[in-house]
Amino acid sequence: GGRPYRIALLEGGSPDYGVRMADFVREGASQWEAADLGLWFSFTGDTTDADIVFQWRESFGNGNQAGVTDLRWSNSGRVVRAYVSLATRNAGDSLFTDDALLGAAVHELGHAMGLPHSTESTDVMFPVTRVTVPSARDRATVRLLYALPPGSLRAPPR
């Protein structure tokens, strides 16, 4: 039920940016839609209308880090907007592979929907993901998260 997550894709941001960068995000959204969780995504050119805003950068300068998601929360504990940054290169200045970029897109979309990191390396939400398809555990976490009333779950203190 509900409405789709609206995604805005900001072009550019990295010298390596190309139209296929948007394809990684679209494919990542398709992977979550295919997980049969009742989630779906639409794409908008208007960032003010978007729930999730993707932008690109060359590198985070931090090892193989490929993505970061910054969440904005409502007072009632709902994610109101997510800002996702994806890098095209690692700190060693090597281009990320297509699989790494797809995995990062799927992983960061998980964060944008409110999912935390997983301790299981076969999950797309594992911090150093090698996976491009949400696992059974990832899907179960989404089901649990979306079954709870807003504000009943809080991120652990850092």
Describe the role of every protein-language-model region.
Residues 1-19, 71-76, 151-156:
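Disordered inhibitory propeptide/activation segment of secreted metzincin zinc metalloprotease zymogens
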Residues 19-106, 112:
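Metzincin-family zinc-dependent endopeptidase catalytic domain
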Residues 70-100, 116-158:
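Metalloprotease/metallohydrolase-associated module, dominated by Zn2+-dependent proteases
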Residues 13, 58-60, 130:
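Short, internal active-site loops enriched in acidic
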Residues 16, 20, 130-133:
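A general boundary/transition motif marking the beginning of the first structured unit of a protein
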Residues 5, 50, 121-122:
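Residue-level recognition of the N-termini of beta-strands and the immediately preceding loop/turn
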